[in-house]
Amino acid sequence: MIDRLIDEEAVRTSPIHFGLVMTELGSLRSVQCPIEDIPEGQLKDYMLASSACFPALRPREIDGVKYIDGGWRDNMPLDLAAKMGAAELLGVDVDGIGIVRPNTTGLPTRIVRSHWDLGPTLDFDPARAGRNIALGYFDTLRLFGRCGGTAYAMLPDNEEFLARFAEQYQKLLAEVCARAPEIDLVEKNARQRANYPAPYAPNPSAPTRGALAPLELAAEHVGVPEDMPYTPKLLAATFMGSFDKDPADRFPALLDGRDNTLVAERAIAAAVPEEFVTALVSKTLGELPIL
């Protein structure tokens, strides 16, 4: 496949300066290789060595020396990019095997990270690869301010649906906290455990990542697909169509004031805060016009 896809001459003459990192197997020494240091005719060998994820893949031997994946010693070679003349850096952290070295370049740096589990390093399933490519695209758009959200790619909210959702969500949350004051901490804990931003500030109804967080968290919890963009209203509608039994039915005492099961529901909410937030989001959306 590499013979079919890689044109060495095109790489060498490209205005985009190419480089790679390998790890010398015997010494575990990191070897940085800008394109001009790679001998003519050997680029494909160097690329195979740089991606030889040992021990699953065999080392690649070059001039009598065995090399493995450069990520073992330097999984985000920002230093190499700086040495090659970069004025600012864009790194991609796939949370893979290997060492991510501290960024000591002093250059302006942005790092693309995914909220989602990207799967095993050696999972080459085409469907997963397509999903991860889409997620990487959305994560990059988000980093450069072209879309919003934390987990989902959120498009502009031209209908101000998010503001209405946030206002109603905060109203219902305050009512629940009046029945069970610890629920405020439960809601914050759900965000923290699922890597979502803290609650709203300074305006509870402002269309911020914090305001989106409960809706995104609930959508993730019920399995709303993550590899497509959404407006807040579309995400809400997709969430509401993703279950047969309403999550809000699990917390009638907390959400509707039926005291007969309040103690048990408080315990459940504390144990699985994501379940409670999902229920509260469902209750909120049930009181808003979506379609």
Predicted regions mapped to residue ranges:
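Patatin-like phospholipase
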Residues: 1-291
